[in-house]
């Protein structure tokens, strides 16, 4: 089973985020393999161990994003692809999906594409579904568990009301939740081996895309630091409690 896993180099979510205008500051900020993508890498590795094949990592970003690819390789993935181009600075989820789709098509045929549900730096959650559309693949989202078989993939899908068990013929795309597995730690041997594993670095030209093809067609209306939550107010009901709660909700524009 040949598996493609999408990975992202994100600012360390354990550190305070900084803004650079209307974008999240990335230059000079410590980055990591996005925690959500670790579950995708682990899912790919478990399927490879069960069915054979290869796991190829795909990422888009500046040169420093190679660190995230190497991290995934140290976990056990076989090779990686990084698409890096100055024209991609500030790319949105739509552009990211378009570029990753072109890279996956160029790299060869894959039985399964795996992605995390959403990244910790953007939380849009739209990229994987858009990627499936560009690739023309069926998609199974929010997988809590998965099981591969010859020619099919079956997942237990988390929903608001419980779980659905769904299956799809391959090739397909799936997104995995944080509860799908326990990502393995990279061993020292794995870290050293990752340095020698092949990583292709492509530009837009290598994908036969131009700067016009990746023009961002949407803009951020505004960005700001979220206000800290204020301490709640305790109301002792002396007969006017309901009215005071109603007034509070009206002030908050809830009702």
Give the role of each language-model region.
Residues 1-255:
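N-terminal glycine-rich FAD/FM-binding segment characteristic of electron-transfer flavoproteins
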